[in-house]
C-alpha cells in the first residue's frame, strides 16, 4: 500500500537523515517558552516541540528532543548530534547558512519594559540598560541598527529570557529586546505580567523556519511536506490554538 511504501521509504532514508537511524532529533533552547521549554512535569514541551513530535510520528521516526546551548547550535548541527534547529528560529539574516523549511510563522523583535518605567518609544531607550539573549535574532537586529543600539547606555547579553525577566523585575536592566511571540507568552504566564509592556515600535519583522544542515534537502523536503499536510488537515491550527489561543501559522495561507 501507499502507506507501507511511505513507511519503507522513511525507514530506508532514516539512516542518511537521522542523527541516529530511525530518529528525528530536534535541537532547541530549553529556556524559550512557549516554543520549547521544560514543563511543570519536568518533560520538554512547547509549540515547536509539539509540531516536531507530530512530524516525527507521521514520518515513522522516533522523536528525540535535544536541548542545546543556543550559541552552540551550529556546532551541534554540523556534528550531526541534531537533525535540525526548531525553536523559534529566525530565518532572516541566516538565509544562506542552512537548508530551510518554508516559513511557518511570522515574528517581530520588540522591547519589553516595566509599565511604570516612563519608556514608551525607542527614543526613550537612550542611556538605558538593554538586555538581549546571546546569539539571538534580537542581538543580530541590534547589531544591524547601530544608530539605535549606540544610543543605549549599555547593551548586555544574557543566556536566556527567564533570567532577563528576573533582571527586569529587579530593576537591573531597563528593557529586554526579544521575540514578540515569546514576550507575550512570558507576560501572560507571569503573575506580575501586568507590570510589563511591549513597546509599539518594533525592532525588526521576521519569519520563523526550521533550519537543517546545509545540503540536507531530503530531510527538509519530508518535513516540509508533512507540515503542509498538517496545515491542510487542521492539526497545525489545533496545536497553535492550544498554545496561543489562535492560529499564528502561515503555511498554506
Spell out what each predicted region is.
Residues 49, 64-75, 117, 155-170, ...:
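Short helix-initiation/N-cap motifs at beta->coil->alpha
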Residues 49-58, 128-129, 134-137, 184, ...:
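Extended ligand-binding regions for polar small-molecule ligands
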Residues 1-44, 57, 118-129, 253:
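Immediate post-signal peptide segment of exported/extracytoplasmic ligand-binding proteins
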Residues 53, 57, 62-124, 202:
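Acidic, polar ligand-binding/catalytic clefts
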Residues 62, 137-156, 194-198, 228-253:
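Ligand-binding clefts/hinges and TM-proximal coupling segments of bilobed small-molecule sensing domains
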Residues 30-33, 44-57, 89, 110-163, ...:
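Bilobed "Venus flytrap"/periplasmic-binding protein-like clamshell domains
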Amino acid at each position: 500500500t501507499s502507506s507501507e511504501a511511505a513507511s519503507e521509504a522513511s525507514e530506508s532514508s532514516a539512516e542518511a537523515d537521522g542523527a541516529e537511524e530511525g530518529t528525528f532529533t530536534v535541537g532547541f533552547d530549553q529556556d524559550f517558552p512557549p516554543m520549547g521549554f521544560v514543563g511543570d512535569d519536568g518533560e520538554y514541551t512547547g509549540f515547536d516541540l509539539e509540531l516536531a513530535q507530530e512530524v516525527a510520528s507521521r514520518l515513522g521516526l522516533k522523536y528525540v528532543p535535544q536541548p542545546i546551548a543556543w550559541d552552540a547550535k551550529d556546532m551541534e548541527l554540523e556534528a550531526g548530534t541534531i537533525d535540525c534547529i526548531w525553536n523559534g528560529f529566525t530565518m532572516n539574516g541566516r538565509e544562506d547558512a542552512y537548508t530551510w523549511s518554508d516559513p511557518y510563522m511570522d515574528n517581530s523583535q520588540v522591547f519589553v519594559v516595566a509599565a511604570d518605567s516612563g519608556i514608551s518609544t525607542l527614543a526613550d531607550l537612550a542611556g538605558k540598560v538593554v538586555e538581549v539573549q546571546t546569539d539571538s535574532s534580537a542581538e543580530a537586529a541590534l547589531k544591524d541598527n547601530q544608530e539605535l543600539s549606540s544610543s543605549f547606555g549599555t547593551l548586555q547579553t544574557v543566556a536566556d529570557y527567564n533570567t532577563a525577566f528576573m533582571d527586569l523585575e529587579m530593576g537591573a536592566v531597563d528593557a529586554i529586546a526579544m521575540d514578540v511571540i515569546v514576550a507575550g507568552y512570558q507576560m501572560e504566564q507571569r503573575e506580575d505580567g501586568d507590570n510589563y509592556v511591549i513597546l509599539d515600535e518594533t525592532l525588526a519583522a521576521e519569519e520563523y523556519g526550521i533550519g537543517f544542515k546545509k545540503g540536507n534537502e531530503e530531510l527538509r523536503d519530508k518535513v516540509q511536506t508533512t507540515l503542509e499536510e498538517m496545515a491542510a488537515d487542521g492539526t497545525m491550527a489545533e496545536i497553535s490554538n492550544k498554545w496561543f489561543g489562535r492560529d499564528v501559522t502561515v503555511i498554506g495561507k
